[in-house]
Every structure is written in C-alpha cells, then in structure tokens.
Regions:
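Hydrophobic residues within membrane-embedded alpha-helical segments of Major Facilitator Superfamily
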Residues: 13, 20-23, 61-63, 142, ...
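Loop-centered beta-sheet repeat module
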Residues: 159-208
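Alpha-helical transmembrane segments and terminal signal-anchor/GPI-anchor hydrophobic tails
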Residues: 193, 211-274, 289, 304-306
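Aromatic-anchored segments of alpha-helical transmembrane domains
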Residues: 23-26, 97-98, 165-179, 220-234, ...
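Interfacial loop-to-helix transition and helix-capping segments at the boundaries
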Residues: 47-60, 123-138, 177-198, 229-254
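Transmembrane alpha-helical segments of integral membrane proteins
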Residues: 288-299
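Structural signal for the C-terminal ends of transmembrane alpha-helices
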Residues: 68-76, 147-154, 174, 201-210, ...
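Membrane-cytosol interface segments of multi-pass membrane proteins
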Residues: 1-169, 300-337
C-alpha cells in the first residue's frame, strides 16, 4: 500500500470514528436522563447491542492510527517532535478541558469566583474533566513513551512484536476482564494501560496484517461473544465492550484492517468527508457540549427518543465543526484543532 493510500484510509478512519463516537454519546447521554430511560428501556437495550459493532471500535482505532503513524520506523520521532505533540494535548486540556471542568462545577454547585476556578484546575489535574477527554490524557502518555517504543519496533521482528502485543493484551485487557466478570483482583490498575496495547497493535496491524480469514474470524468471534453476553447480563456486556476489556481489541483490529483495505480511495478535496476529516478532532472534543445543551431544553426532551438522538448527533457534528473553525481563528488554536 502506498503512503498516499495509507494516509487516505486513516483520514476515513478519523471521519467514521468521529461520527461513531457522536452517535455513541447520543445514546449514552439520553440514557442518563431518568424519564427517558424509564420510558424506553427496551429501545435502549437494543441500542446498546447495536453500539457494540457500530461504534465501540472508534476510540481503539484512533489509538491504532496513531500507533501506525508514529511508530513507523521511517518516521523520526525526536524529542522536539514529542514535545510538540505533548504540548498540543496539554493545551487542549488547559483550555477546552478546563472550560468543561468549570462548566461542570457551575452546573452542579453554582459559581463561586476564584474558588470555582481553583477547584476546576484541581479536577483537571486529576483527570476529572468530561469523561470523553480520557482519550486526550491517554495520548499524552503514549506520546511520552513513543521514543522508547519506536526504538524497539525498529529492531524487533514480527514474532517479537506479536509476543509483546499478546502479553500486553493478556496483562492489560484480559486480566481486567477476568476481574470484572469474576470479581477477582488479578490486575489492580484496572484499565490504565490498554491504550498502549492499541498503539502497538496499530503499528503491527498496519505492517503485517491483511483482511484475511484469521483477522475476520478473530474479530467476529470477539464481537459474537460480546453480543451473546447481552442475553445474560446486559449491564456487564456493555462494560465488556469498553476498550480496556478483552473483546474490544480483536474486533477493533478487524475494523482497522477493514478500513485500510476497503477505504483507500482519496476524498474529494471539497467534499463533506474531507471537511469532516479536517475537523474530526474538534468534533470529538466539542460534541458533548451540544448534547448537554439540547437535553436542558424541555421541548426537545419530549421528542421521540430516536428523533432526539438524531438531533443530538446532527447538532453535535454541525455545531462542533462551526465552533472548531471559530476557535481556529484564534492564533493559539490555529495549529491545535
């Protein structure tokens, strides 16, 4: 695969992944409204099941795209480059993440001047901003260890990488899954390391894997096992679909390889997909804001659930694109979003 085609497929991954995340969060946000959940329990269960194959692969694939690009032996990851990547994410947290922390405190407790800002900053340092920003915190950690991982993949064989990836998967994804299902404590730091597995898996998959029977079979088996779990314990099954548990990696690898294999065609320069690709990071960061606003409007909350969720998706994507482009007019944000 040529570099151009590889880049194009990753652009498609960003677009599809961003849209998938917005759809997932529309379901999650509406489920958290008690009156909506009580009146639509069966529909929410069906949506939870559908979200596994349609949306849960998105954030893992984001990590895998980063790993495929940044761990490429042909790419020089100097400390200066790492510093720029880390500063970009830190800037996002110190601005957008901090604003979300302030909004959360004001909505919950009211505004108390400097005390609110101090509490918001402490929450930000502890990772207590809006939940979807865990991805940004994780990227900072991945960028910091990229020089070490990059040096390793330059000398590692395919077998070496496979062993490291499998051991990491066992320790950081399988063990937490056993803990969740059986109530054991095989791995005390539950879920903290799974992004590393996806980061390495992205490089491995981009280098060695094709869309063949093995990849399809492993992904389909993991997906089927996760879906079967809904018949026994829907709440547990929903948790097992998260990236830090064992079912997500095989299916996410399948999604990643499928996108690389099937979506190699370039986007039209002035097309919708290209526009969404340019704004995909902003869409990921900003879309929850619009969902929160919509769910505070009584007239909108009374809409039929699918209509309400579609409204959240459409307004979330469109509003995020507009807000992203407005923020880019400010010099500090121009190269960050």
């Amino acid at each position: 695969m040529s570099e151009r085609k590889t880049i194009q497929s990753y652009e498609w991954a960003r677009v599809l992944g961003a849209l998938a995340v917005v759809c997932l969060h529309a379901v999650v946000a509406t489920r958290l409204v008690p009156e909506l959940h009580q009146g639509n329990a069966a529909l929410f269960l069906a949506e939870d099941v559908l979200c596994v194959p349609l949306t849960r692969w998105a954030v893992p694939v984001f990590f895998m795209v980063s790993g495929a690009l940044l761990l490429d032996p042909g790419r020089q990851m100097t400390l200066e480059k790492v510093g720029r990547y880390v500063w970009r994410m830190a800037f996002i947290l110190l601005t957008i993440g901090f604003a979300f922390c302030v909004m959360e405190l004001v909505a919950s407790f009211g505004f108390y001047g400097l005390l609110t800002f101090q509490a918001a900053f402490l929450n930000l340092l502890q990772g207590l901003s809006w939940g979807h920003l865990w991805y940004v915190y994780a990227l900072i950690g991945l960028y910091l260890i990229t020089p070490i991982l990059s040096a390793y993949v330059r000398v590692a064989t395919q077998r070496d990488l496979a062993i490291v990836a499998l051991v990491g998967y066992a320790l950081l994804c399988v063990a937490p899954t056993i803990d969740l299902v059986a109530g054991t404590k095989l791995y005390a730091f539950l879920g903290t390391g799974s992004p590393v597995v996806y980061y390495l898996a992205g490089y491995y998959a981009s280098t060695y894997l094709e869309l063949d029977a093995k990849v399809i079979g492993a992904g389909a088996l993991a997906l089927a096992a996760n879906l079967v779990a809904f018949a026994f314990d829907p709440e547990l099954a929903s948790q097992l679909a998260l990236p830090e548990y064992a079912f997500a990696l095989p299916f996410s690898v399948l999604a990643f390889v499928a996108i690389r294999s099937l979506l190699e065609r370039p986007m039209r320069e002035r097309g919708l997909a290209r526009a969404l690709a340019r704004d995909s990071f902003g869409i990921y960061l900003l879309h929850p804001l619009f969902g929160h606003v919509i769910l505070r409007v009584p007239a909108l909350v009374t809409l039929p659930l699918p209509v309400l969720q579609l409204t959240i998706v459409v307004v979330g994507v469109a509003g995020s694109v507009v807000l992203t482009r407005l923020l880019r007019l400010l010099p500090p944000f121009a190269s960050k979003l």
